[in-house]
């Protein structure tokens, strides 16, 4: 197994199998660390400077430099070429190495320089191989004993939310850094220059994350279903497939018609069985089987072979029909590498041969013209990437994403596209369509009718600020046709309105202060009795249970103002039976009679409840008033004649004995018309001035 894998985890999975380590024949490698890279410093600048240093420090050595991707390799090569030209340096040969190169170009990077083929015999010429992680484990590069490592790798990560794989630049693991450094010690002692510090080395993850954690799981899911396994939990894994990616894979296979759900779980359909006989991604096997079912084996094989290989065409040419014309020999493109043409055509022939042994479920209905065929086949493979042009420009995809065509005037004239590849645009400008072909809209009524879904939509229209119900014909997020409905089932309508209320909050409903106080009174009794006998009337609980208490009353709500017409007090009061409402009024009354004879409102929105009353109205009251049968003392806000708080207390007797006299001293001169007796416990409580008593 590879040195970059976690051997202990594999051993544990295999019942604690013994681990045998073979170090191989290696030579010592000196590790030379750099400084931590500054936030605005380009990795290319650091790489170019370090390669120059490595060449000067090791004038008889060739260098292997690890960069994250093709773009960085090309830019690094350009800057080194300028340096070599400006300095008139002789004998330094730059060799890129990445997967998109031809076999001949890759061989130039791997093979020794002419005259340097004998081990241990070096001339003055030096080779600089600028490589992706393709050179980390799988290739042996002759003559290299110096490595310059950027510490970065470009990884393909599948996003199950949108069903697409994107490239992300990440730091390598410790295991990968050791593997890369080891390239310098294959044939003699070497050096490894790392573009990061020793401290940063210690912070790297021990191992790279397993591919299964970031991959498109559709091929795996199809294979497991072929074995009769419809859930990852039925197997033992080093790393269990992520649930989100697995569910996306199942959804994709279902949309391709490869699987169906039965009582005991997911099973392959006859169409899915045919797909499993083709050693390609399920999207392409579906394309091939659909092509065979329409008697279009050759065009389907050609398109599948095109989608299987790296695209050598310029990013400015997204039209797949142009590529197909070149592959089929209908047009010529001298700049396209002949090796790519040969490989792709050979692969197409292999697909044709494999399809002769595949039995499609039957001939499909509806005729398709040769002009419609590429769009149809591509839409079969990528139904989630069917795209429609927006009025504002660009395209919207069936998966809900937006994307643009850059410099594609001919292709951009089409209202509908079948899209094969979409890439993220830097700078937050959305996605870019990299390869696509025009799609005939009439196919949605014929050959692609299975992709069209009928859906009844009941929702709150934000723009119109009203409830709407309509029948929609959709392909994913793309609405083909809308038909307004006069009525929908009450359950669907209430569900839509409840969803809107949850988004906007309970403030949409016609609350009154009295109703808010009623809910607070119920909440108080609920807290005293430990949740027994009384409903939860908190905002959180009411929002969570809208289906139970509000849904039956929403049938007449269509406009925003209709919410205000609801008799919310009656609806909320219905949460408490009549007998309990009488108990509520007794245990948690809305008002309290104070010594002056006034009936003062109790505020239950605070904890404890608050009684705000003028100080003079409480003369003679020694005991703090309570509610809930004496269990909850009220918090007394004693107010000035002007209604401003003078004292807040739950100990009324203690206030009269102590703090009252300080308050009296401060307030008597300010409010001389009101009584300020020396002994408030024997004074007559009043809400009047002294002259009116």
Residue ranges with predicted function:
Residues 155-165, 368, 373-374, 565-581:
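A short, flexible low-complexity segment enriched in Lys/Arg and Gly/Pro that occurs
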Residues 182, 418-440, 614-635:
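Short, solvent-exposed cationic patches
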Residues 2-3, 31, 133, 196, ...:
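Active-site proximal loops enriched in glycine and acidic residues that flank catalytic Cys/His/Asp
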């Amino acid at each position: 197994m590879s040195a970059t894998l976690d051997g202990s985890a594999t051993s544990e999975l295999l019942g604690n199998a013994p681990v045998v380590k073979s170090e191989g024949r290696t030579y010592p490698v000196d590790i030379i660390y750099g400084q931590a890279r500054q936030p605005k410093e380009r990795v290319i600048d650091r790489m170019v400077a370090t390669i120059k240093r490595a060449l000067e420090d090791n004038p008889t050595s060739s260098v292997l430099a690890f960069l994250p991707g093709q773009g960085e390799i090309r830019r690094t090569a350009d800057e080194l070429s300028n340096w070599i030209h400006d300095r008139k340096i002789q004998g330094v040969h730059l060799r890129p190495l990445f997967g998109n190169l031809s076999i001949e170009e890759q061989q130039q990077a791997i093979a020794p320089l002419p005259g340097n083929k004998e081990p241990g015999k070096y001339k003055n010429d030096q080779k600089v191989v600028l490589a992706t992680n393709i050179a980390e484990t799988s290739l042996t590069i002759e003559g290299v004993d110096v490595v310059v490592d950027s510490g970065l790798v470009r990884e393909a990560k599948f996003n199950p939310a949108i069903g697409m794989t994107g490239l992300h630049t990440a730091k390598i693991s410790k295991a990968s850094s050791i593997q890369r450094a080891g390239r310098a010690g294959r044939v003699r002692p070497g050096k490894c220059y790392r573009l990061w510090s020793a401290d940063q080395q210690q912070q790297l993850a021990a191992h790279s994350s397993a591919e299964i954690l970031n991959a498109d799981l559709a091929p795996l899911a199809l294979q497991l279903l072929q074995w009769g396994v419809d859930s990852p939990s039925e197997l033992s894994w080093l790393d269990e497939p992520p649930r989100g990616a697995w569910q996306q894979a199942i959804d994709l296979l279902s949309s391709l018609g490869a699987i169906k759900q039965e009582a005991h779980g997911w099973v392959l359909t006859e169409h899915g069985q045919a797909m499993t006989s083709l050693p390609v991604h399920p999207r392409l096997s579906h394309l091939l089987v659909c092509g065979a079912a329409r008697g279009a084996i050759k065009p389907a094989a050609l398109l599948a072979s095109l989608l299987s290989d790296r695209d050598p065409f310029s990013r400015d040419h997204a039209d797949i029909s142009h590529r197909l014309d070149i592959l089929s020999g209908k047009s010529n493109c001298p700049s396209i590498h002949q090796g790519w043409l040969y490989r792709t055509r050979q692969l197409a022939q292999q697909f044709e041969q494999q399809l002769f042994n595949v039995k499609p479920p039957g001939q499909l209905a509806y005729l398709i013209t040769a002009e419609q065929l590429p769009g149809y086949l591509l839409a079969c493979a990528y139904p989630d990437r069917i795209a429609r042009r927006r009025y504002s420009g660009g395209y919207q995809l069936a998966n809900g994403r937006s994307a643009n065509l850059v410099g594609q005037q001919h292709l951009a004239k089409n209202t509908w596209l079948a899209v094969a590849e979409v890439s993220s645009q830097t700078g937050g400008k959305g996605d870019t369509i990299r390869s696509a072909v025009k799609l005939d809209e009439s196919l949605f009524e014929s050959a692609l009718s299975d992709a069209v879904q009928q859906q009844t939509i009941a929702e709150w229209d934000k723009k119109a600020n009203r409830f709407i119900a309509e029948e929609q014909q959709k392909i994913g997020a793309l609405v083909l046709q809308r038909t307004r409905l006069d009525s929908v089932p009450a359950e669907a309508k209430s569900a839509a309105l409840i969803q809107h209320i949850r988004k906007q909050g309970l403030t949409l409903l016609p609350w009154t202060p009295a109703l808010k106080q009623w809910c607070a009174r119920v909440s108080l009794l609920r807290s005293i009795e430990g949740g027994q006998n009384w409903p939860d009337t908190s905002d959180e609980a009411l929002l969570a249970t809208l289906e139970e208490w509000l849904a039956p009353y929403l049938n007449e709500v269509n406009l925003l103002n209709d919410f205000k017409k609801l008799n919310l007090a009656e609806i909320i009061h219905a949460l408490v039976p009549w007998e309990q409402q009488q108990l509520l009024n007794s245990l948690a009354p809305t008002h309290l009679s104070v010594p002056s004879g006034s009936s003062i409102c109790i505020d239950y929105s605070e904890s404890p409840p608050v009684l705000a009353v003028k100080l003079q109205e409480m003369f003679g009251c020694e005991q703090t008033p309570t509610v809930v049968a004496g269990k909850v003392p009220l918090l007394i806000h004693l107010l000035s004649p002007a209604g401003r708080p003078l004292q807040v207390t739950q100990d009324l007797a203690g206030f009269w004995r102590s703090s009252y006299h300080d308050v009296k001293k401060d307030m008597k001169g300010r409010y001389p018309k009101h009584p300020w007796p020396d002994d408030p416990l024997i004074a007559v409580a009043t809400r009047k001035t002294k002259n009116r008593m």
